[in-house]
């Protein structure tokens, strides 16, 4: 008699357990779906057929201390060797676009200040890394590459100027006849490019920010390193630090969404060959990939 009375209670517990398991599974599947959607990329941009044919010299094919980075001789040397080039673009206070890596002028120009605070006239008074080379404008670099090899153009934002920078670069590229793609660490710059010129091949730069915290709060490191704003930027490619290339989210972007992978910055021939064997496009420096 006691066992008969306990049976309904047992069945209720069993049903409750099954419902709990089902709810947990549904929640996990929903989270997995949301996570996958957050990593969204755009597959098969028509530019890849050409862009994938090249290796890209990081800030030009520089040879310090004689040929400084992001200098016209470095870009000419890249073209002469048949390489594409990666470069960095800043917006000056007078609207000029300049090719330079850091916002801070100290490392490469040996003066205090921010490049965004300069005019073109002030920019041309500076010299690169103790040489006689000037900091080039974006126009000067584009003139070299227009009938030559492709460019990977990184948008270097500062002080929330992502919209103005993206607009200036897109408008200048409207009349450019050469081959190029655009990348940035700043997802808001890519959102601007997407809105202004959706046809442009665009890429999200990233890395494992937990290894190099870069002054970012933990949540920004997590979001940026795991590419969780892709659903807003919808990049055609992911340019990820080569040493961090095994990261789960990067691999998911490539496998699930078909994103093109670009690897930076490669400094050894064996790493370059490993990168290309994986189908990634290399951005290299400090060696000649064509030398045995």
Regions found by a protein language model. Name each.
Residues 1-17:
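Short, Lys/Arg-enriched N-terminal segments with co-localized hydrophobic residues
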Residues 16-292:
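Phosphate-group recognition and catalysis centered on beta-loop-alpha active-site segments
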